Amino acid sequence: MIETLTTLEKAALLSGKNVWESRDLPRHGVPSFFMADGPHGVRKQVGSGDHLGLNASEPATCFPTSATVACSWDVELADAVGHALGREARALDVDVLLGPGLNLKRSPLGGRNFEYFSEDPYLSGKLAAAYVRGIQAEGVAATPKHYAANSQELRRMSSDSVVDERTLRELYLTAFEIVVREAAPRALMSSYNRVNGTYAHENHHLLTEILRGEWGFDGVVVSDWGGSNDPVAAIAAGANLEMPAPGLDSVRQLVEAVRDGRLDEADLTARAAEVLRLALDGRRTPRPEIDRDAHHDLARRAAEESMVLLRNEDGILPLAPGTRVALIGDMADTPRYQGAGSSAVNPTRLSSPREALAGSGLQLTAFAQGYRRHSPVDHDLERDAVAAAADADVALLYLGLDEISESEGVDRRHIDLPDAQLSLLRAVAAANPNVVVVLSAGSVVDTGWVDQTHAVLHGYLSGQAGAEAAVRLLTGDATPSGKLAETYPLALTDTPTFGRFPAEGRTSVYREGLFVGYRHAEAAGRPVRYPFGHGLSYTTFSYSDLALTDDSAEFTVTNTGSVPGAEVAQLYVATPDSAVVRPEKELKGFAKISLAPGESQRVTIAFDRYTWRHFDPTTGAWMTEEGPRRVLIGASSTDLRLSGELHVSGVTLTPSVSPATLRTAMLRGLTDDEFNDLLGITVPRDVVTGDLRRNDPLGDLSRARSPLARFAHWVLITLRRRSEAKGEPDLNIQFLYNMPFRALGKMTGGMVSDEMVDGIVDLANGHHLRGLRTVIAGFFRNRRTARDLTRQLTEAR
């Protein structure tokens, strides 16, 4: 069909019709396809749409977030959740589900970490691939996001991620590579930010050379909402769809670029053909009936298999039937079960801990609120909680991060729990030492307070059935089997990006290179609170009889305890005396095994294309280094039970840079000169001065020359502070603060053209007459162009 389309029609396919739909071509029978957010639940909005989820959405199952399910280390579970997401999307006539998110967790301060899987690319990629396979098996296109090197929320639509090629390939692209190669997603979302100076949505190296050329991706690359910069450059680079609805200004630019020879029509045709295929493939699967009870049970099982038992002193858990329990904490009554932002789901139902305890066999002696969610210490509530704790066998305390602490649009300032909760914990522990904490947080928190507890069960953000899952684990109806998918440091100062995350200027320089998460902690010799892969159980497991072949590692895992349980066996690879800088070891495989008491199972973990390789930036290719490898098997990154060595065939390397020199520099944080001398990358000067530019965020209006623009900034900041003080993040304000001027032309449904954006920037810079003239002329030109192009498209029908 693509040959029958005019240049105008092909260009029209490459931008959205409205907030959630692609543009249709009725003359050719080309339908629009409907997109919806959905990393952990389908968010199809009722009525008019908005990207941030402020308007109500249809009820859907709220599954645990990706950060939670990552702790299950269970590919089959991720596949099952993906199937459920796909079925619910299909039932709501959603053709393209915008997820899963698999950005690497570079820092625990990332405001959106709750949406992402892990600090490790291999674990992230394997789980995300399972999600994608499940979603697409139900006839819905999955959209892994945000590609690539998108680590911070501050200035997220304009920041430039400066990262060396090896780090980019091995850490920030590998998860996407695994998903593309193993699950063949039909769509992929580019990120807002620049990567080494070029916006991700128009980055030829990322989109054409790597994504399409090396990995074989043949689907649709969609911009994040408002994330397109130059539509002509985007199509030339390998992107397809500009969202949400920039009107017909982008269509005009594409048609003119083809006519003027600035854009090869073959590129336009190829990109339009990919959008056309996605549109025609949609809605071929009948709408299924949804068993909401079954999906709720799946959400509970997902939470149950993902929660991590961090501490269990004196075997206080599981709690015996009849144990007298005081239930304490605002989150015990109103659970925190998902993050804020575009992924927020309207759950089909929601269980609370108070309700879940009712049929648990435990004796609930009292409930005490203990603290107010977004307020300082309330001594009256604290006294009531202390009295309740003193009169119980166990104080069951629900703590966690509040809604303002982690949200799309804003990064975290620290990793501490709120002061009111820490004060409550101290007071309750003084009254009753048998404190069991259930923790709710989508990312790393400082757990320096654990010595005041007997047990800590980390539920992450566990979805609509998380309260039921937690109670089943607390009472022994289920055995904890979750393992951390990220490192818990002793302090924020121990993390590799401390003091420079989030980057406040125009550039975010990845000075730590390869050393993120456990890779950094081990290489720097930093002790941690809880290592990557850590998680306790009510039973114990032994490992034995490691056998290595060229293709796999085989070993035996035995349940040596008295209750059934599941173990996550982890395979790491170390390269002794490597000629290139490397982490101490890296995760290269894992398996989750369920065993009855006394049962043994032989486990095989196959080696794959990711096991031995490293990226050589000099040749621009993946290499396998000749030499010995140590294969390490264990229950966490630090609890290693078995090891063996084998020789790997490959190439003998002669490094151009001393591994020791580069390692030292990365662990300390590469300077600008070292980036240039050791990695060949020139770090751009990061000076935010002078006139505002079209790609500067509205948060920079503080330095505008126009008093009116500075007043607008004051209003923006005032509204932002008020919402934060109430503990209710205003996502519109957060979005506007980080939104560049150019996005005004992408988020207003065609009301503002690129020419008008230039005029608005002139106005902010104090060039009032020129700016006003440009805005007025641009307004009439934009309206005339939209009318003419609409007429041409209508006549073509």
For each predicted feature, which ranges?
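Long, compositionally biased, glycine/small-hydrophobic-enriched stretches that function as flexible linkers
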Residues: T682-R797
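Glycoside hydrolase catalytic-domain context in secreted enzymes
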Residues: M1-R613, P628-I633, S637, G749-G750, ...
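Charged, amphipathic alpha-helical linkers/stalks
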Residues: G644-W714
